[in-house]
C-alpha cells in the first residue's frame, strides 16, 4: 500500500493525484492568520513505528484505542494516539475522527495542539501529536483552588487568542472545557480535542447538539439551531468564571435545575466580585445576538489590562518616543477608548469599573466537576461541501419529521448496517421565513442533559469517550419540509474492510466539481481501493493491547512543515506607562511560568488600585479628542 503525505499547494500546477482538496482548502478566508493548505501526494515507502519511537507510559484509554507517551530518536517527547478500525462501528464517529485530523493539521497556532504525523495501515490509524507535559487546566485549578487575577488573565488571553484564530478561519470548537485545555512544559495553554469542531458559515445554522453540560449554551440545552461562534463564546464565559472564582457557575448535580439555570442565565453570584464580572455577564447573555463575540472579548479592557496590544495584534514599533511622549499617550488613549466603548455605549460610568459588594444570601458554592462531552447530531455532510452548497438547495431538501430516525450511538454493541441505510442530512439550516398564519418549525422538547457525566481525557477525541462513558439520550431537531430520498441499504460484508479511510477521495477531499452533486459518506470500502472480500480483518480479540508496538508497517500521511512560531515577546504594560510597579507575587502556586522581574513583565494591575483613575481617564480622553 502506498503512503500519502500532505503538502502545500504551491509552485507548479498540481497533478491529477493532487486535485483532491480536503477541507483546509475552504478554511483560508482571512489574510491573517493563514492556515496550512493540504493536498495529497503519493510516496512509496512504509514505516515501522517500533523503530521510530520509544513508547513510554499510557496517557489515556478510550473506546477505540489508547494514547501513549513516546520519545523520538531526536529526544522530543510526543503523544501517540492509536485508533483501531475494527472498533469503529458508526460512520458518524469515523467522520468526526477524520474531521479532527484534518482540522488540527490545518490549524497553526502556538496555543493549539499540533499534529506532527499521521500513519495508517489496514487495522489502525496512528496520530503523533504534540505532548503537553503539565496535564490539563482542570487538575491545575483543582490543586490551587483559585488563581490570582494576573494568572487568570494570562491563561484567558491565550485561550481567547486560540479561539479567536479558529473563528477567523471559520472553525468552531464546540467543546471548550477545562479538560480539553492542556499545559505544556512552559505553562502555556494548548487547546486539544477538535473532535466536535466544524466549519460554520454566516447565515446558516448548525444542528449538532454537542458539548459538555456545564459548558453548554442555552441554544444547545434547548435544542435550537445556532450559527457556531456564539456557542464558543458562552463556553468562554464559563471558563472565565472558573478561572477568576475557582468554582463552577452552575449547579450540575440535577440536570433539570441545570437546564433551567442555563436557559435563564442564572449563574451564581460570586462571593468576592472581580473586575471581570462585567465580561462574564456579557459572555453569559442568554440572547446569542447580545452575547459578546470573540472580537469583543479580544478588545475588552479586562483582557488587555497590563498589555500594550489587544489579543491577536502584534506590537507596533515605537518611532523614537519614550513612555511619556505624545505617541505613547496617544496609544494609551486609543486603547482606553477602544476597550471602554461598550461601557460608554451602554451609558455606564467610570465608577462601574470598581468592585461592588457581594450580594446577600448564603448559597453553597459548587466545586469543580469534570465533564463528559455529549454528542447528539444528525449526520453532518462534508465540511468542504457546506462551504459551496447553495442556500436554495438547503431550503428545498429537508427531511420531514416522519422520515427522521435517532442516530446510532457510538457505544452500542450491535450495529445492523444491513437493516438500516445510512441517511445523510444537511449540516446546516438556512433561515426559514415564517408567515403570520404559519406555525413555526417544531423543536425538540428535550435537550442533551439526561444522565450523569463521566471523566474524559483531553487528548482523546470527543467521539471516543472513556470506557465507562455513556451516550446521552437526546431529542432531534425536526424541520418541516419534503422528505429526502434515502440511500439504499449497505451490504453487511462491507464493514469488514477498513483500509485507507484517510487517503482517497472521501468526505473531506473532494474536488469542486464533485461538490456540485450531493454526496454521501459511503461505506468504508468506498474510501479505499477494492480488496477481495475473502480476506477479512482479524477479530478484535486477536489484537493485543500492545499491538502498536508490533513490527507491522504503516503508511505515512506526512503533514506539511508548520510555519515557524513567532517568539512570545514581552510588551510594555500600562503599569510602566503610568510609572507604577507591582510587587512580586508571593506564595506557592501563584504563578505558573517563570515571570521575569523586569520592566517588561506582565501585569495584573487592577483599575481599582489607582487612586486617580478618573483623572487619568479624563486626561486620556482629552488627548484622544485633540488627536481626532
UniProtKB/Swiss-Prot annotation:
Stress-activated kinase involved in tolerance to glucose starvation. Induces cell-cell detachment by increasing F-actin conversion to G-actin. Expression is induced by CD95 or TNF-alpha, via NF-kappa-B. Protects cells from CD95-mediated apoptosis and is required for the increased motility and invasiveness of CD95-activated tumor cells. Phosphorylates LATS1 and LATS2. Plays a key role in neural tube closure during embryonic development through LATS2 phosphorylation and regulation of the nuclear localization of YAP1 a critical downstream regulatory target in the Hippo signaling pathway. It comes from Pongo abelii. This is NUAK family SNF1-like kinase 2. PANTHER family: MAP/MICROTUBULE AFFINITY-REGULATING KINASE (PTHR24346), NUAK FAMILY SNF1-LIKE KINASE 1 (PTHR24346:SF93). The lineage of its organism: Eukaryota, Metazoa, Chordata, Craniata, Vertebrata. The modification Phosphothreonine is found at residue 208. The active site is at 175 (proton acceptor). The modification Phosphoserine is found at residues 435, 523, 544, 547, 573. Residues 457-469 have a biased composition (Low complexity).
Amino acid at each position: 500500500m502506498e503512503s500519502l503525505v500532505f503538502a502545500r499547494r504551491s509552485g507548479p500546477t498540481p497533478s491529477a493525484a493532487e486535485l483532491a482538496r480536503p477541507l483546509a482548502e475552504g478554511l483560508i478566508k482571512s489574510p491573517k492568520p493563514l492556515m496550512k493548505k493540504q493536498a495529497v501526494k503519493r510516496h512509496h515507502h512504509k514505516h515501522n513505528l517500533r523503530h521510530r519511537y520509544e513508547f513510554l507510559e499510557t496517557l489515556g484509554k478510550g473506546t477505540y484505542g489508547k494514547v501513549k507517551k513516546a520519545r523520538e530518536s531526536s529526544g522530543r517527547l510526543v503523544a501517540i494516539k492509536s485508533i483501531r478500525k475494527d472498533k469503529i462501528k458508526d460512520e458518524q464517529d469515523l467522520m468526526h475522527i477524520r474531521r479532527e485530523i484534518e482540522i488540527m493539521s490545518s490549524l497553526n497556532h502556538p496555543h493549539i495542539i499540533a499534529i506532527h504525523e499521521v500513519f495508517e495501515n489496514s487495522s489502525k490509524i496512528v496520530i503523533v501529536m504534540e505532548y503537553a507535559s503539565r496535564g490539563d487546566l482542570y487538575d491545575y485549578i483543582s490543586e490551587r483552588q483559585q488563581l490570582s487575577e494576573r494568572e487568570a488573565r494570562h491563561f484567558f488571553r491565550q485561550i481567547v487568542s486560540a479561539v479567536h484564530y479558529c473563528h477567523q478561519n471559520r472553525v468552531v470548537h464546540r467543546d471548550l472545557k477545562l479538560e480539553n485545555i492542556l499545559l505544556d512544559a512552559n505553562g502555556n495553554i494548548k487547546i486539544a480535542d477538535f473532535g466536535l469542531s466544524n466549519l460554520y458559515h454566516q447565515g446558516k445554522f448548525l444542528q449538532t447538539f454537542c458539548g459538555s453540560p456545564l459548558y453548554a449554551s442555552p441554544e444547545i440545552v434547548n435544542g435550537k439551531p445556532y450559527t457556531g461562534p456564539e456557542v464558543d463564546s458562552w463556553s468562554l464565559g464559563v471558563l472565565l468564571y472558573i478561572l477568576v472564582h475557582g468554582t463552577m457557575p452552575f449547579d450540575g448535580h440535577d440536570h433539570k435545575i441545570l437546564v433551567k439555570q442555563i436557559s435563564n442565565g442564572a449563574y451564581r453570584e460570586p462571593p468576592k466580585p472581580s473586575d471581570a464580572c462585567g465580561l462574564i455577564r456579557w459572555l453569559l447573555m442568554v440572547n446569542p445576538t447580545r452575547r459578546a463575540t470573540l472580537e469583543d472579548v479580544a478588545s475588552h479592557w479586562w483582557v488587555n489590562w497590563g498589555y500594550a496590544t489587544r489579543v491577536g495584534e502584534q506590537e507596533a514599533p515605537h518611532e523614537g518616543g519614550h513612555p511619556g511622549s505624545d505617541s505613547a499617550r496617544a496609544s494609551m488613549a486609543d486603547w482606553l477608548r477602544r476597550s471602554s466603548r461598550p461601557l460608554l455605549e451602554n451609558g455606564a460610568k467610570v465608577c462601574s469599573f470598581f468592585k461592588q459588594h457581594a450580594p446577600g444570601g448564603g448559597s453553597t458554592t459548587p466545586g469543580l466537576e469534570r465533564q463528559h462531552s455529549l454528542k447528539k447530531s444528525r449526520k453532518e455532510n462534508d465540511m468542504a461541501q457546506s462551504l459551496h452548497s447553495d442556500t436554495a438547495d438547503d431550503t428545498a431538501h429537508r427531511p420531514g419529521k416522519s422520515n427522521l430516525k435517532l442516530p446510532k450511538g457510538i457505544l452500542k454493541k450491535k450495529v445492523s448496517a444491513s437493516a438500516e441505510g445510512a441517511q445523510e442530512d444537511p449540516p446546516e439550516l438556512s433561515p426559514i421565513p415564517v408567515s403570520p398564519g404559519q406555525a413555526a418549525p417544531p423543536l425538540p422538547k428535550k435537550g442533551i442533559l439526561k444522565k450523569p457525566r463521566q471523566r474524559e481525557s483531553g487528548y482523546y477525541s470527543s467521539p471516543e469517550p472513556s470506557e465507562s462513558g455513556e451516550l446521552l439520550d437526546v431529542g432531534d431537531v425536526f424541520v418541516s419540509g419534503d422528505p429526502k430520498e434515502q440511500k439504499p441499504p449497505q451490504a453487511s460484508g462491507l464493514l469488514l474492510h477498513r483500509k485507507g479511510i484517510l487517503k482517497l477521495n472521501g468526505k473531506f477531499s473532494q474536488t469542486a466539481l464533485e461538490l456540485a452533486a450531493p454526496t454521501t459518506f459511503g461505506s468504508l470500502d468506498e474510501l479505499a481501493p477494492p480488496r477481495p472480500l475473502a480476506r477479512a480483518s482479524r477479530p478484535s480479540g486477536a489484537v493485543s493491547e500492545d499491538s502498536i508496538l508490533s513490527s507491522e508497517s504503516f503508511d505515512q500521511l506526512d503533514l506539511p512543515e508548520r510555519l515557524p512560531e513567532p517568539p512570545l515577546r514581552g510588551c510594555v504594560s500600562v503599569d510602566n506607562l503610568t510609572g507604577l510597579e507591582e510587587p512580586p507575587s508571593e506564595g506557592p502556586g501563584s504563578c505558573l511560568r517563570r515571570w521575569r522581574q523586569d520592566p517588561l513583565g506582565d501585569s495584573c494591575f487592577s483599575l481599582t488600585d489607582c487612586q486617580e483613575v478618573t483623572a487619568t481617564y479624563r486626561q486620556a480622553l482629552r488627548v484622544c479628542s485633540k488627536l481626532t
